[in-house]
Curated annotation (Swiss-Prot):
This is Chaperone protein DnaJ. Residues 27-86, 99-125, 362-388 are annotated as: Disordered. Participates actively in the response to hyperosmotic and heat shock by preventing the aggregation of stress-denatured proteins and by disaggregating proteins, also in an autonomous, DnaK-independent fashion. Unfolded proteins bind initially to DnaJ; upon interaction with the DnaJ-bound protein, DnaK hydrolyzes its bound ATP, resulting in the formation of a stable complex. GrpE releases ADP from DnaK; ATP binding to DnaK triggers the release of the substrate protein, thus completing the reaction cycle. NCBIfam families: DnaJ_bact, PRK10767.1. The gene is dnaJ. CDD domains: DnaJ (cd06257), DnaJ_C (cd10747), DnaJ_zf (cd10719). It is found in: Cytoplasm. Disulfide bonds: none annotated. GO terms for biological process: chaperone cofactor-dependent protein refolding; DNA replication; protein refolding; response to heat. It comes from Salinibacter ruber (strain DSM 13855 / M31). Zn(2+) 2 binds at residues 173, 176, 199, 202. CXXCXGXG motif repeats lie at residues 153-160, 173-180, 199-206, 213-220. The keyword Translocase does not apply.
Amino acid sequence: MPRDYYDILGVDEDASDKEIKKAYRKKAMEYHPDRNPDDPEAEQKFKEASEAYEVLSDPEKRQRYDQFGHDGVDSGAGGGRRGRGRGFHDIEDIFDAFSDIFGGAPGGGRGRGRSERGRGRPGSDLRVSLSLTLEEIAEGTEKNLRLQKYLECESCDGTGAEGGMGGQNFSMCPKCDGTGEIRQVSRSVFGQVVNVQPCPRCEGEGRIIDNLCDDCGGEGRVQGEESISINVPPGVMEGNYLTLGDAGNAGLRGGPSGDLRIEIEEEPHEHFERDGLDIYYDLHLSFPEAALGTEVDVPTLEGEARLEVDPGVQAGKILRMRDRGLPDLEGSGQGDQMIRVHVWTPQELTAEEEELLDQLRAHDNFQPRPPEEDTQKSFFRRVSDVFS
């Protein structure tokens, strides 16, 4: 038998949207698969919390659930469900279309029904940059961020009124009679035209505050600092971003919080250049090493590794170290580490060194010649031969 959605989130049946959202965020952070790898029970609880929030955050679905239970929201009842979990994107889903690696507020929770009219105005979104090393990108990492932002005023529970919801500090707006709207009806040759605008007296809230909170001056929010912890999956790249729903600035007088968008930046690396999933490293060899072959230790993202260089390697040759690059964000493969060979030529020689090199220069093996694949006639030369 399916568990009760209110029990899953740990809230009462008369819980407000704000309480439901807060409970869901707590459960999601506690049971998120990134925080509980290889824990099937935590993954199941995360899915249950997500399913419960999808229903209880939607006024229409919640009404059907309250009236008919699970039958009211299961497939085929009351219009059916749109697919489990599709109403939101969590930190894994942000990479689905990855220009959206980090995309979307849970449960479409920014929308509000008519019963929530007057719960303040939404807070603005925040954008921050997160700088990562290639090593962190390769392994995935957990980062702590300290944010300067608007926080909900604790003194008034975000209402802007002294004493919060428990106080008798609100009265119906006399201008709009609590509707939050001003309707103006005019007549034209086409009939009646109704113009609806937010009430300027109560700013569309339908109520006015009689006694303002001293701490926030009636805004329901104060400036402060908040620390958050985020899990960055392996394989992200410059320009990707994470979106954490409801982690932006708190709204005015109980309005929903904005989102937090975390944009990924890659730190320059002392050894490597990135090209997609591959990384490039420049290997400098002396002339004898290139001619005779050698074994060298080269840096990789996992530490030093031994590389064997065959005799006669040419400058510009690309050597490949398989699976030493970066992982694919969606887990479908691993890049390689590419080694660009550079042959170093000495600029100052002793008389003895000049004599040795002069002797070598006379031998046929030291005369430059093109690689085997270049000894064939070019396409244009072969075409020319046909018509000559």
